[in-house]
């Protein structure tokens, strides 16, 4: 393969809100430049996971290399990175952007700028990208390209007068996009003669090849057989394969500066390849590392337990496998009296949690129960020490706590005008404080400060339902603030059920507790004795429901005769019930757990 001069390489990514057509545009670019034959084309070529295709979202960032013969007669190489649009996977976005010099900003001409569009554009601007706006779906009857163009200028503040008008589905205007990439995006900078310096963009596990590493070469050349060193982990490997994706894996002899491709080097664990690390030559290393990116910090925690206790080892193996491909997912073992053995897992957000849960049940055929999601709280103790806890069970004695702090976020919500009232009410109910409210055409953009604790439960679902699905939402963590939080426990027959204990705000405890005990009452079947179900804060019971006992008619065999005979039998039954209540064990069905955890706050 002839080497293309570095000035003819373009590295770019596609950023957009969920569902604005990034992956479809990527399909068209691949098709137009001949990356795949027509029979190999399927919709969303780059969304390789089943879940991605089903939900129509992109989870893992994907990359592909295209050859393009431009109108000026030159041959260009495009490296396209398709990135996720959802807020939980912003981490995947930031690392794709670090490997590129430019971005195509795709905006749906019928929907306009959404919250995620903003977040991702700011990521791209932070990475120093040149941005080309692209208006997609202009063939829809509801499309308003002129208004959306104005909106891009007003909200994001970039010049959209030369925005490219396309319809990715029908292929309209794709050639204009390709020319815009050539003329409006900058080529990468790099020195072929300098020592090797490459950025580790991503890594995943392949059953045959071991760990496959996605790299962006900055300076120097990567060749087969070369010995490389990872500067962060200080491990050295011999390169076995070097190549790129067209989206199929294609091997080459070397990757030069500005190119994006993959390498394999007999690496066993994905954990050995830190995303954002710098790769260099073992013999001629560079002295300073490339600026990496911040490692992803889990924000939401929850316990995952197998419904069938025998599945525990399968679950452990499955989690290990997912961890191979998803560096932002973390877990540790935990045991619960009610649910047995399981894992405490950390996620980037609720969608991430849902996806992992779904992948576990799908790819590994596991039945799981998830406990209530919680966030990291900081406890300042009276003896001056500070604790971080994400499991309510670990909470120290109340007497020892001087102050509890909880994480807050800044949420940006874009919503059509007519739903603004209900959106504001929802945020108000969740202890939010409004920061600003601006109008962009007929849409309102609200910024709210909210406690993360209130958001992880079901905020996103509620937001979608009060706005009929039109509002979009994006958030980032700001800081920790003191909060009046209490630990609420659910007692069944005077025994605390550890899987249901949670930290709630004092003002919300009673409502939450009442809802949970009512739900439990419906779902716990009657036993031979009375079962009280209580919600308690410390020693104070805040809500109670009772499951009535089943009773056998012991006086059925008495015909007439003396009343004392009946009384004797009834007293005897009463004694037995009392004893039973003391020693009897209550079986809580799995549905009761699941329902209690789903109780709407």
Curated annotation (Swiss-Prot):
Designated name of the protein: Elongation factor 4
Residue intervals passing through the bilayer: none
Entry similarity comment: Belongs to the TRAFAC class translation factor GTPase superfamily. Classic translation factor GTPase family. LepA subfamily.
Positions that bind GTP: 19-24, 136-139
Residue stretches in coiled coil: none
GO molecular function, one term: translation elongation factor activity
SMART domains, per the entry: EFG_C
Top-level taxon: Bacteria
Enzyme Commission (EC) number: 3.6.5.n1
Pfam families per UniProt: EFG_C, GTP_EFTU, GTP_EFTU_D2, LepA_C
Domain tr-type G, residue spans: 7-189
Record PANTHER family: TRANSLATION FACTOR GUF1 HOMOLOG, CHLOROPLASTIC, TRANSLATION FACTOR GUF1-RELATED
Reactions it catalyzes: GTP + H2O = GDP + phosphate + H(+)
Membrane topology designation: Peripheral membrane protein
Family annotation (InterPro entries): EF-4 (IPR006297), EFG_III/V (IPR035647), EFG_V-like (IPR000640), EFTu-like_2 (IPR004161), G_TR_CS (IPR031157), LepA_C_sf (IPR038363), LepA_CTD (IPR013842), LepA_IV (IPR035654)
Record has Cell inner membrane as a keyword: yes
GO biological process: positive regulation of translation
UniProt keyword annotations, A-Z: Cell inner membrane, Cell membrane, GTP-binding, Hydrolase, Membrane, Nucleotide-binding, Protein biosynthesis
Physiological role: Required for accurate and efficient protein synthesis under certain stress conditions. May act as a fidelity factor of the translation reaction, by catalyzing a one-codon backward translocation of tRNAs on improperly translocated ribosomes. Back-translocation proceeds from a post-translocation (POST) complex to a pre-translocation (PRE) complex, thus giving elongation factor G a second chance to translocate the tRNAs correctly. Binds to ribosomes in a GTP-dependent manner.
Subcellular location: Cell inner membrane
Alphabetized HAMAP family for the sequence: LepA
One GO CC term, this protein: plasma membrane
């Amino acid at each position: 393969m002839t080497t293309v001069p570095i000035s003819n390489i373009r590295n770019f990514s596609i950023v957009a809100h969920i569902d604005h057509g990034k992956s479809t545009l990527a399909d068209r670019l691949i098709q137009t430049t001949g990356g795949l034959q027509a029979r190999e084309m399927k919709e969303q070529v780059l969304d390789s996971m089943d879940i991605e295709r089903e939900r129509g979202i992109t989870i893992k960032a994907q990359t592909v290399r295209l050859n393009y013969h431009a109108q000026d007669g030159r041959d260009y190489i495009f490296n396209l990175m398709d990135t996720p649009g959802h807020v939980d996977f912003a981490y995947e976005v930031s690392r794709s952007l670090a490997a590129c010099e430019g971005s195509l900003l795709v905006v749906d001409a019928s929907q306009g700028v959404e919250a995620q569009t903003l977040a991702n554009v700011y990521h791209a601007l932070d990475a120093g990208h040149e941005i080309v706006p692209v208006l997609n779906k202009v063939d829809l009857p509801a499309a308003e390209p002129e208004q959306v163009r104005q909106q891009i200028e007003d909200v994001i503040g970039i010049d959209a007068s030369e925005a490219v008008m396309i319809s990715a589905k029908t292929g309209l205007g794709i050639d204009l996009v390709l020319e815009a990439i050539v003329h409006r995006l900058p080529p990468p900078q790099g020195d072929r003669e300098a020592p090797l310096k490459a950025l580790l963009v991503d890594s995943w596990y392949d059953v045959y090849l071991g760990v496959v590493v996605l790299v962006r070469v900055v300076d120097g050349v990567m060749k087969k057989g070369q010995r490389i060193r990872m500067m962060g982990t200080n491990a050295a490997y011999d390169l076995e394969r070097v190549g790129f994706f067209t989206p199929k894996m294609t091997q080459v002899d070397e990757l030069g500066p500005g190119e994006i491709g993959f390498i394999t080097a007999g690496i066993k664990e994905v954990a050995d390849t830190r995303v954002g690390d710098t790769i260099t030559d073992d013999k001629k290393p560079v002295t300073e590392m490339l600026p990496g990116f911040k490692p992803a910090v889990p924000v939401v925690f929850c316990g995952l337990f197998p419904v069938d206790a025998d599945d525990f080892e399968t679950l452990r193996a499955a989690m290990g496998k997912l961890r191979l491909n998803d560096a932002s997912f973390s877990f540790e073992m935990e045991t619960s009296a009610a649910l047995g053995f399981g894992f405490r897992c950390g996620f980037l957000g609720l969608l991430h949690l849902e996806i992992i849960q779904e992948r576990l049940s799908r790819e590994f055929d596991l039945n799981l129960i998830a406990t209530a999601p919680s966030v990291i709280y900081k406890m300042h103790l009276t003896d001056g020490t500070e604790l971080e806890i994400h499991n309510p069970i670990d909470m120290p004695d109340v007497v020892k706590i001087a102050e509890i702090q909880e994480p807050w976020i800044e949420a940006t919500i874009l919503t059509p005008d007519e739903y603004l009232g209900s959106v504001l009410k929802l945020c108000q109910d969740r202890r939010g404080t409004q920061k600003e409210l601006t109008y962009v055409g007929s849409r309102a953009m609200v910024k709210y400060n909210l406690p993360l604790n209130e958001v992880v439960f079901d905020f996103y679902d509620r937001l979608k339902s009060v706005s009929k699905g039109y509002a979009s939402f994006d958030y980032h963590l700001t800081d920790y603030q003191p909060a009046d939080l209490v630990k609420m426990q659910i007692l069944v027959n005077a025994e605390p059920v550890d899987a249901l204990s949670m930290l709630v705000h004092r003002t919300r405890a009673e409502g939450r507790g009442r809802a949970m005990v009512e739900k439990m009452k419906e779902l716990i079947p009657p036993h031979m004795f009375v079962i009280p179900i209580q919600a308690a804060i410390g020693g104070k019971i805040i809500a109670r429901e009772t499951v009535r006992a089943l009773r056998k008619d012991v006086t059925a065999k008495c015909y007439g005769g003396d009343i004392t005979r009946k009384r004797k039998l009834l007293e005897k039954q009463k004694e037995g019930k009392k004893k039973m209540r003391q020693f009897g064990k209550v079986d809580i069905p799995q549905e009761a757990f699941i329902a209690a955890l789903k109780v709407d706050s």
